[in-house]
Amino acid sequence: KCIPMNRSENDIFERINWENGMDIDANDLIMTENFFLNSMYKMKQTSLPAFGYGLLPDKNLDTQDQGTDMEVYHTVTDKVEIRVNRCLGVTRSGFIVDYKAGVEDNMSLKITIPAETIRREITGKANRWNILLTVSPYERVLSGTPDNATLPPRFPYVKPSYTLSLSPIERTIISANVLILGRLRMEGERFLLDYTYIPPCTSLTAHAELIRYYRYFGQMFNSIEKSSKDIVAKVINRSDSSPIAINTACICKSILHYTAMCFFEYRNLGMFWHPAKMIDCYSSLAHICFNSLNFLEKTEKEDLMQYFYEWSDISPVAFESLMNEAIDIEYEHTDLQSAFFIIEKFLKALSELWQMLVSLDYIGRHKDNIVIGERKYSDNRGKSTEWTPFDRM
């Protein structure tokens, strides 16, 4: 049972003037409780950064289980049922959402919507909807086991009210007490949970897919660093290195300076970074590569980019485009997947190109007159004998 208080986060709660001998009732105590709750939320809200809201990591779960546990069913009666089993997050107002199904029968968190109602909201190519959880901190949901021995008989506890809703992605507004839990997509005439979508998260450890990205990017980051060391060693140990080889080594040295600055923090703290910081880490790497190329004289840059093209099948225009995309990312807290996909494309291209160059006996000679050494690398997703940021995890 929910006891509505008709309150919102915008209400002003006054402190009650307590006097000895005054008559009091439950409403006076509830008003005092709401005053302190409201003050606490306002204090939290002032300390939260702009992107400080979203899912929180659950220390009681394994990494592969992090994120909201949610189910979507399209029934035979053409209705869409969304059921939330577990959710842990923080709203923009600083309110902690900690919901577990089955703990309290009074707090079943689900919604059933006729599929035709959702279809009527389709506009153009927009066939995705955000699944929203709204918390009402001042509505009191009775919880616990009723105690009939007390007078009057009552439920011992109350919890805030949670409700689910759907909103087309282009019309979604993240208000102070709303969390995006996931995304619904339409496939044919059926509605399914979009498992590729990553909702707003407060850290990489809050979602299994972000943890996977951390590990995968770490493998490629490690590969780029190792290849950069090998390229520099090959170039400086030859007295007849060409300008192409020397310029490649210069880029590698810039990369190595950057990885040296990132090494400790990435290895020890990277898993707990905010998603925006992870994007910043690799966007900065792209910027370093871009600037290093542009420090070269124009013809030398063109020769080097053309040389990369010979060994990577990535044209100079495409390679610069990958760097520019990674540099120019505009972080969207509600669309993490897009930013991580851009970074993944850049890292994969750079990692494969660098590994290809390492396999050459002589860096700088062109493809038609060079001996290709044995390639000693495998798929980035495989195991590596070198250090990776998650070796200790």
Where do the protein language model's features map onto the residues?
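Short amphipathic beta-strand/extended segments with alternating polar/hydrophobic composition
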Residues: 97-105, 196
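Elongated alpha-helical scaffolds
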Residues: 108-147
